[in-house]
């Protein structure tokens, strides 16, 4: 989101009017706003497999060195608050890593793991880093530690509720651009 805001600021003088909408997970339920993280979890929960006591779901996120990486802790906390058991968020390029999550799996007696990307597209990271045949893929690492591993190779863009959330944000941004009443007040808007 900080990148989008930087691009917005770079080009704002080239347009008569411009607005920037909010990201998929922006609000956290404060000040009468929606809880986007809870709505996100509800949306992706339609993809969660049924799990027994010795099964876990690992949600693979991208990760970043930016401060926004802390949002993955918020997602994990909300998953826990919502009562989901043995669902863990980890990242390819940030914290928590797969290595951070594996001790939790062992502690909880997990034997079977499903890996699922929480990325818009199940692309290179999902097919290679997560589910690849190389010894350093997440699937191979988990298998080498004795876990049975399934993979779910679908991106968030395939989820109708996620697509609807993006359409809603685009409509909110349009309403803010048009100065419509009730438009989300946190949109960045610039008018000449």
Please report, for each region that a protein language model flagged, where it lies by residue.
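Extended amphipathic ligand-handling, pore-lining, and cofactor/metal-binding catalytic surfaces
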Residues: 1-114, 119-192
């Amino acid at each position: 989101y900080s990148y989008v805001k930087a691009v917005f600021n770079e080009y704002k003088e080239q347009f008569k009017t411009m607005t920037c909408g909010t990201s998929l997970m922006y609000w956290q339920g404060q000040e009468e706003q929606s809880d986007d993280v809870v709505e996100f979890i509800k949306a992706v929960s339609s993809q969660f497999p049924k799990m027994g006591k010795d099964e876990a779901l690992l949600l693979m996120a991208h990760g970043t060195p930016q401060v926004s990486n802390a949002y993955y802790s918020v997602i994990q906390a909300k998953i826990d608050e919502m009562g989901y058991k043995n669902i863990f968020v980890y990242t390819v390029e940030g914290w928590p890593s797969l290595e951070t999550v594996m001790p939790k799996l062992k502690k909880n007696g997990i034997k079977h793991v499903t890996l699922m990307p929480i990325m818009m597209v199940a692309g290179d990271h999902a097919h290679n880093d997560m589910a690849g045949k190389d010894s350093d893929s997440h699937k191979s690492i988990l298998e080498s530690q004795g876990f049975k591993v399934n993979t779910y190779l679908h991106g968030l863009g395939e989820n109708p509720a996620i697509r609807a959330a993006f359409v809603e944000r685009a409509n909110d941004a349009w309403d803010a651009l048009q100065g419509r009443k009730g438009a989300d007040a946190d949109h960045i808007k610039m008018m000449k």
